[in-house]
Amino acid sequence: MFEKKQKAAQPEFWVAAQQLPTSPKSTFYSKLDETLESFGFAAKVRAICVPAYKQTGTGRPGIDPVVYLKMIMVGFFEDLPSERAIAARCADSMSIRAFLNYELDEKTPDHSSFTIIRQRLGLDIYERIFTLTLHALRAHGLLRGKHLGIDSSVIEANASLRALVHRNTEEQYWDYVKRLAAENGIDPEDAVAVRKFDRHRPGKGSNQEWVNPYDPDAKIGRTKDGATDMIYKPEAVVDLDTGAIVQAQVHPGDQADHKEMATRVLDAQQNINQAAGEERDTLTVKTVTSDKGYYAVNELQALQQEEIRTVIADPIANRRLHKLEPNQKKAVAAARRSVRSKSGKDLLRRRGMHIERSFAHILDCGGIRRTTLRGWENLNKRFKLAAAFYNLSQLMRKLFGIGTPKQLAACGRLLFLQLTYLLAVIARIVHRNSSARIRIWYVGLKDRHISGLTTFGELPGSSTGC
């Protein structure tokens, strides 16, 4: 029989701290906390963020930036897309409260605090926090900086195509289309005819003509599934030897991939030098690997002049080399040789493995494929943090064999299956050996009229018979 739980007539006025409920210790977040403590994350972050806070000693103290970063970590590892969801999850979970060092009687930060802290901390502070994780990776041999891969993906902006306005006339999109239809002799009230007219109208999605007033930085472009939407373009530079992200930034959705590629690669080299404690002009990068979207002859020249090998396929198969300058011909030929070589093909395979994996973890499993933030700066800050947390997961995988909560759960299931298989193998071996012993024993005792001994558990020496 069970006891029916009744609603309390009057809540308790005083509750002893010893009577408060406690949660079982979260294995993942305890390991994450150990990882952060291993390279002094909290003290270094506070030292980085000190210039952003006033030191007058008056007024209400601000929220610890370490708490803010840990809450964003929770959103990354648990695929929470919005800051409201992150704040609700942190307030609801006792294990996450322990990770944040918050007691049950303390109120966790509200989602509105995220906006204030994000605006308070400049982009340079986020860059230094990202470099802090590179220091930790370097200390554990997870950052080499010789072979780099670069690629971009798509983030769907928190903006709608319906809200587009014309840059010159400030007309809404459909009002503008109806006016053009009327000028071409089409009834503007006929929705089918107007849509057909708009469908066949050239240059209708030009970013030079249209802007979203709620997020002017978002651009019209194609999403991953081919649909037209307002987008941003995140880009990651990855160490192809270890999978660590050495640079992460967000570009406008209409920017070409190859634009200033050489400059961005050299900026990634600066991050590697800072993590390794080397001089700024030290060059460790040997190769740069990417897809056809990053192919530009001038960019190839710039990288090859720095003695960096370019493994980037030419999108034009029958490129007319006789129209190029001698130096350009040399750069194109060198890139072709690199792509066709055995080492180049290996680098292209590693580029697909490491870069696509990083985008899957950050965008699809990290909650920012469809962003809830607006503005290039806000999104760039969030993407840098997500890349830093991805590097933390790489470090956790090195130290503890797990990098995400889902991987920890999968390891438990895998361990159970392995133990089950091991027990099955042991049982089969025991069964074979015991069957042979039983047959010998049965033949020896048959004259004493002892029969029916068919299992090993019934033999002398087994007290439980199990």
PLM region descriptions:
Residues M1-D33:
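Hydrophobic alpha-helical membrane-insertion signals
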Residues S26-M73, E78:
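Basic, short loop/linker segments at the boundary and entry of helix-turn-helix/winged-helix-like folds
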Residues E37, G59-V67, S82, E106-P109, ...:
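Secondary-structure capping and boundary motifs in well-ordered enzyme cores
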Residues G40-K44, P51, D79, V237-T242, ...:
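Function-dense linear segments that define catalytic or interfacial modules
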Residues D64, A91, L100-D105, P109-I308, ...:
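Polybasic low-complexity intrinsically disordered regions
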Residues A85-F99:
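DNA-recognition alpha helix
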Residues Q255-H258, K345-N433, I438-Y442, K446-S451, ...:
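Basic, amphipathic alpha-helical segments enriched in Lys/Arg and hydrophobic/aromatic residues
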Residues V297-E377, K381:
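Helix-centered, glycine/charged polyanion-binding patches within enzymatic domains
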